[in-house]
């Protein structure tokens, strides 16, 4: 099968030196980019309905840039001033680096794992008399839940945002040789937008 068109279910990279640019030059293929899902923040009213009292938590568990953005967005909307003494437990260096958009980086209050909270076990246990809050979307990775529970700390989840299906109706009559997905939610979006989708000769690539 000769591949001429590819649809990537993610935003277009801002870097012109991405692997996709190399594919386009080398194989003369057309690559389009389109988000199949996107994130929406919950309203202050929706968060209040969860009875979240931010003042009770001196430690925040951050798993992604979205969790960072929506934690500070909703606390501002609810007029809660995040105390300077708040400690942040970041799943990765990328999350910790992004956190600097909102706070001054200090080693004493920002703890960074190597894509795994297990790396921070000793630090979590050090503060096991305090409460921890994890800002999340609709769900949290089961491995993270298992890890945090194993530390025997007092932690709670607060849904501050949600992942929703993007409108792809304008692609109804557009066909691609390959569709590339990066999460089950992307595939779910495909079938919610196009319930009668037939794969036929289209190739499906998953990451």
What is each residue range found by the language model?
Residues 1-207:
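Conserved beta-alpha
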